[in-house]
């Protein structure tokens, strides 16, 4: 079974995405406009 990881904004803690496996993700928060990175 694959685990689901939640991606939250580092500034305002808004839930941005729920992902299974990801190598690299860059996403901009629609609320506070901060660009978030994850590996």
UniProtKB/Swiss-Prot annotation:
Species of origin reads Haemophilus influenzae (strain ATCC 51907 / DSM 11121 / KW20 / Rd)
Could you identify this protein by its name?
A: Mu-like prophage FluMu protein com
**A Pfam family in this protein?**
Zn_ribbon_Com
Query: Which family is this sequence assigned to?
Result: Belongs to the com family.
């Amino acid at each position: 079974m694959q685990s689901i990881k939640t991606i939250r904004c580092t500034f305002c803690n808004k839930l941005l995405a729920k992902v299974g496996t990801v190598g690299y993700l860059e996403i901009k928060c629609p609320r506070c406009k901060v660009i978030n990175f994850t590996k």
